[in-house]
Every structure is written in C-alpha cells, then in structure tokens.
C-alpha cells in the first residue's frame, strides 16, 4: 500500500474511531492524556505522584474541582485498550515508598492507566448530559518516539542530508568521526551489502548514544528506536543509516542506496505512522516534560538542540 493510500486509510479509520469515541463519551466521557519527555525527564515519577495524590486526597491547588470540594471519589479501573501494557502504578509506588527505595525504571515502552473521577457537575446541562463521572486515560510513552514524528514528512534523502549537516557542528562533529569515516567509504550506487548496512547502522547508533550522554545532552536524535530498540533490535527496520547522496541521483534497484531507503521507509510506515495514528492522534491532551537543567548544564549547543527538538515536534 502506498504511503498516500495508507495515510487515507489511517485518516478514515481515525475518523470512524472518533465518531465511536464521541458516541461513547456522551454516556461515559473520557479524557486521554499523553505524558512523555526525553529519557530521565521524570515521566514515571510524575505520573505516579499525581495519581497517588488523586487517590489519597493529596494537595493539588491548581485542580479547581478538588479545591472546591466537588470531587467525591477517585479510583483505578481496567484500561480500555487491552493490547496496551498497564502502567505499573503499584510497582512504582513501592519503589518510591518501600523499605528499599529507589528511582523507578525509565519508560521504554507505551503503557496506560485508567483513573475514574466521580464529581459534582456544575450547571444543569452538564449534569444531565455528562453525569458525574469522568474516565481519565493516562498514556505514558518514551519521548524518543515523539521526536520521530517529523520523519513522516521527510524522505530518506532529506533525512540523510539533515542528519549529515547536523553532524558538521560541535559537539556532534567530534562524536561522529568514526561513523562519518565509515560513511565516506561507502558508495551509495554500489550493490546492496548487508554487512555494510549493519556496520553503518551500528556506528550510527553509537553516535546517537554518544550525543545523548549526560555530558552532551543533545535531544534531536531520531530515529528514536535506535536508542530504544526493544523487540526490534537486530531487525532490518533498524539496520539503516544516512548516506552522503547526490540530490539529483535517484536510488537504483539493488543498490545500497535503495536498501537504506527501503528500510527507512519501512521504519516510517511500520513504526512511526502506527504510533501516530493508533495513539498520538487519539490524545485529547499532551504533557511533555523537559529536562532543561541537563541541557543548561551541558552548554549552549545542548540548549539550542533542545529548542530545535521541541520546535520540530510542535510542528507535527
């Protein structure tokens, strides 16, 4: 299926799902809130602390309904999406409050938690149409996935050019030396070579990991799954890398260029687009946590890169 037809199909499916959600929401309203942020930004602790405060009557001065005394009851319920892992709320509470206290593990996959709030509605219309119960579905996912969304509007050639151009500036330039040296030995028009593709992908992944290190703290590091591969580790979907391409030259069948381009396109269509249409596009609200202190500590280039990452995401 072409990307155009695939996009039309996904848009139609989302529209149908939206009608269904609207019809269901009249009887039992729900609010889907996405929570994300780059690694070590505090997503897990944030979600756990907010849910704990709601369940146990903690102080949330900006939650107007709570400060007005209109919240009658808050409790957890089974989540609506059976194919999504549950956010391990109880495990994280134990990590933070148990005898052997430690920080919870970082987010490395998408998870969900449903919180139901029974409240006293204000106004006759609101009370009759919406009742006094709201389901809040919290969707937790790695911020690295969010940074992949701009890839939906970039071709392989455009992404390669942008990535290589970014590597010309410090601190990326120093960190990219080994990867760029290998890229310089590759002929995009040469026959496809799996060993060369694997080596290029490995060196590119090492470069991205170095850019994310605490002393550098760069943020614009797509593709996100290269740093959080999960069950995709070692698959062709993650075995590609940018190439130095002639803008006027198209990929020839059977070439290294064609192999890399095909795998990039597959990554976008099989990883990025499903996340966008199945999860991101269905969110009603989005919370993005930003670790500005790490960027400030790493220097001006890290702050500039963080701004670029946020600008790219907000443009999606």
Feature roles, as predicted:
Residues 1-28:
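N-terminal pre-Walker A segment at the start of P-loop NTPase domains
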Residues 19-20, 53-316:
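Switch- and interface-adjacent substructures of P-loop NTPase systems
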Residues 31:
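Nucleotide donor/acceptor-binding cores
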Residues 38:
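P-loop (Walker A) phosphate-binding loop of NTP-binding proteins
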Residues 41-43:
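Conserved glycine(s) of the Walker
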């Amino acid at each position: 299926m072409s990307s155009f037809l695939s996009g039309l199909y996904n848009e139609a499916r989302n529209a149908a799902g939206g009608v269904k959600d609207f019809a269901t929401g009249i009887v039992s309203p729900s609010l889907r809130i996405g929570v994300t942020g780059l690694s070590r930004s505090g997503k897990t602790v944030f979600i756990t602390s907010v849910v704990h405060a709601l369940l146990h009557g903690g102080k949330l001065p900006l939650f107007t309904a709570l400060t007005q005394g209109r919240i009658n009851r808050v409790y957890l319920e089974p989540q609506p999406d059976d194919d999504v892992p549950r956010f391990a709320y109880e495990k994280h509470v134990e990590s933070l409050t148990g005898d052997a206290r430690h920080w919870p593990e970082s987010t490395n996959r998408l998870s969900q938690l449903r919180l139901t709030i029974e409240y006293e509605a204000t106004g006759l219309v609101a009370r009759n149409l919406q009742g006094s119960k709201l389901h809040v579905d919290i969707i937790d996912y790695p911020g690295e996935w969010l940074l992949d969304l701009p890839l939906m509007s970039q071709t392989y050639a455009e992404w390669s050019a942008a990535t290589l151009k970014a590597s010309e500036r410090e601190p990326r330039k120093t960190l990219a030396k080994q990867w760029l040296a290998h890229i310089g030995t590759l002929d995009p028009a040469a026959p496809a070579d799996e060993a060369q593709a694997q080596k290029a992908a490995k060196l590119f992944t090492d470069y991205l990991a170095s850019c994310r290190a605490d002393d550098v703290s760069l943020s614009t590091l797509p593709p996100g799954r290269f740093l959080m591969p999960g069950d995709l580790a070692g698959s062709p979907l993650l075995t590609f890398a940018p190439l130095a391409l002639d803008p006027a030259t198209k990929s020839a069948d059977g070439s290294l260029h064609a192999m890399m381009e095909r795998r990039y396109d597959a990554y976008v269509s099989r990883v990025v687009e499903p996340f966008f249409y199945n999860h991101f596009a269905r969110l009603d609200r989005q919370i993005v946590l930003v670790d500005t202190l790490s960027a400030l500590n790493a220097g001006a280039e890290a702050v500039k890169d963080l701004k670029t990452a946020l600008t790219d995401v907000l443009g999606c």
